[in-house]
Amino acid sequence: MTSDRYNARDAEPRWQAAWDQQAIFATKNDDPREKYYVLEMFPYPSGRIHIGHVRNYTLGDVIARYMRAKGYNVLHPMGWDAFGLPAENAAIERKVAPKAWTYDNIKAMKKQLRSIGLSLDWAREFATCDPSYYKHQQKMFLDFLRAGLAEREKRKINWDPVDMTVLANEQVIDGRGWRSGAVVEQREMNQWVFKITKYSQELLEALDTLDRWPDKVRLMQRNWIGRSEGLLLRFALDPATTPNGEGELKIFTTRPDTLFGAKFMAIAPDHPLAQAAAKDNPALAEFIAECKRRGTAQAEIDTAEKMGFDTGIRAIHPFDPDWTLPVYVANFILMEYGTGAIFGCPAHDQRDLDFVNKYGLGNTPVVCPEGQDPKTLVITDTAYDGDGRMINSRFLDGMTAEAAKKEVAKRLESEMRGNMPVGERKVNFRLRDWGISRQRYWGCPIPVIHCPKCDVVPVPENDLPVTLPEDVTFDKPGNALDHHPTWKHVTCPQCGARATRETDTMDTFVDSSWYFARFTDPWNETAPTTPEIANRMMPVDQYIGGVEHAILHLLYSRFFTRAMKATGHLSMDEPFKGMFTQGMVVHETYRKADGGWASPDEVGIEAVGNGRRATLISTGEPVEIGAVEKMSKSKRNTVDPDDIIGSYGADTARWFMLSDSPPDRDVIWSEEGVQGASRFMQRLWRLVNESAEAGKAAPRDKPATFGTDALALRKAAHGALDKVSTGIERLHFNVCLANIREFANTLAETLARFGTRTSDLAPDIAWSLREAATILVQLFSPMMPHLSEECWHALGHTGLVSEARWPQIERDLLVEDTVTLPVQVNGKKRGEVTVASSAPNPEIETAVLALDAVRQALGGKPARKIIIVPQRIVNVVG
């Protein structure tokens, strides 16, 4: 037996070198075994990995190591999502080129990731800023262009005049750019878009096939796609009230049943009718400008005060020519949703009710809850949006709301204005085409040329990649590509005239929408994928990443896979068979007396009574212990993975990340928890060494029979093996760790009873101890791979445990010899009885009736009936 402590600093780099030297994690594409593809969302090379990365990649690594041990051909690659704005910011702030900054960060982070002991195939590594990667992205852009999946169109955009770039709606805060603080302008610009809307219905329906995705993620995507069935209505306008004699206003509604409750029409500030009305109405023009200044993000609009401006235009009710409705420009209507216009029925829509209450337009209920007297239905501050019967609706009265919808559709579809029906059933989607144009340097160049004679001309494929110039400066606002003296000036490949390159680059979401396919054969120099290989290795069997990517990244990847199928690069529709969203790593916050934040390594904490007291280690100054929050640099509640690995080792960090909390929930970082993981690692090391000593007495061959104690240990070992195997497959890693701890306790108790002196050990006990220790090492090898290699050799095994096959479960050892049954008397639990699993009913009845609690409950009377549910429960009827 050894008394030495396990030395992680010595062992971990040694075993990492052994894995690398033998290239045991390299995946062969021609391997005939069944494949298993596990992938964590690849990181942005910011310069340092954070503790959340450790958790994310440890989760994937456990799966990869387990499936490899189960005999699968595992693909577990790593790369870098390397384009993006931070590199440009670094160029501005630190006077370092984006390329140099990015690749320096990759080098540093790769070293950190290697220190975690991840079983990655580094031979497949790439960065999305590698020309050898984005060359193929540019080729696919041209393929999409030919297939009608990429187009250039004019779009209204948010323009930051200081940063000179387009902003997403979410980047406009209180009418100002999130970064520059400049007042945002609404402009119309040519933008490149991917036609994701061509797949709206397919993307929606296919969510039902993704049964290994979290329900919340599928729901978020379902809501984002936003399918709604309704009616497209053409409201006639009173020409005497319109600026240019406009004849109609189109609206899309999902509630045509509420038409008789209409009180107003509302149009978006940038609706053509609003723009026309504002030309001769300065007050309206100012109102529209104010709406734009207040922000365009949906979340911001939803929470803003509802505001409107009466244009003076009147719309005519489709069922009554004498009934007109005022047309307002409203700040809560967006042009990109539906038609940019609505009719407002305030009694049955809260937003509309808030609006009419402000402007005194009143409301008329038209849907009455079942069983309620319509005369008593009064709407004041809360709209009724439930089902019911129609009231105050003329020919619809008495119908259900659903029947009323059909009746309105039937009548208006048959009524013609000109050569078009007044109403038309339509399916509407919230999803909009994906605008990919970004006015930034550090991104994938869009491979088109603008010619004054030929218009938009694709770059010939033999001229790909269109690479970024490196001699750029960032001394002017806007896109450095626009300012470059030569890069954008080219000759048109069609006519030879002077032309210019497209200076917009692609949204970085494009880079991450197909990288998983490239990993299947990153050595292909002529095409994005090798279809034969990609179709065999894909889809990704288990994808892991944060829930913050539940909508855009995952939805764009699903679109891209379909677009790649349409252009011959893949043959499947869905990229990810299984999706798992891990929780965050969170930490307490510590606030100093001056209001500043202290980092965990600056704070000392001691127990005081039933509470805790925190002070600054340097000064003894009291520190307020704040809420447990997501780790952030601003609140300084971060933990450096290098410090943890340097102090305790990677296996300790990995084990802590997997323990206690289910992996889909947040894990609270605590120094005590890390120390506990470190102590358990040392305990495992001692246990294995003691077992190795005892195992020296074990016969080479498995004994023919086992005594009671040896059999009990074997049952515990194979029971743990079964539970941990099931737990990993179900991603219940914290449960697996609890099972391993429990089994380690059983092994320790057995060693304590029998000792390790080989002369004192019976062959069956010695053999069982060696088997149990071997199984234990293999159970924790996916979680603590370095320790497991050290333990594997301590037990006398040759080779690497990382290459060993997962132990076979002996199912007959999982059958329990006894079973404990709860006993009820007249429906109330009175006790339990333990009997042999194979005990016949008469034997069980005798044991039950012998229980004192049962005799007392029966009051000395015989039982009238005993009902035995096999292996479950016994019911005694007195």
Swiss-Prot record:
GO terms for molecular function: aminoacyl-tRNA deacylase activity; ATP binding; leucine-tRNA ligase activity. This is Leucine--tRNA ligase. Gene3D superfamilies: 2.20.28.290, 3.10.20.590, HUPs, Isoleucyl-tRNA Synthetase, Domain 1. CDD domains: Anticodon_Ia_Leu_BEm, LeuRS_core. The gene is leuS. A motif ('KMSKS' region) lies at residues 630-634. One of its GO terms (biological process) is leucyl-tRNA aminoacylation. It comes from Nitrobacter hamburgensis (strain DSM 10229 / NCIMB 13809 / X14). A motif ('HIGH' region) lies at residues 43-53. The lineage of its organism: Bacteria, Pseudomonadati, Pseudomonadota, Alphaproteobacteria, Hyphomicrobiales. InterPro entries: aa-tRNA-synth_I_CS, aa-tRNA-synth_Ia, Leu-tRNA-ligase, Leu_tRNA-synth_edit, M/V/L/I-tRNA-synth_anticd-bd, Methionyl/Leucyl_tRNA_Synth, Rossmann-like_a/b/a_fold, tRNAsynth_Ia_anticodon-bd.
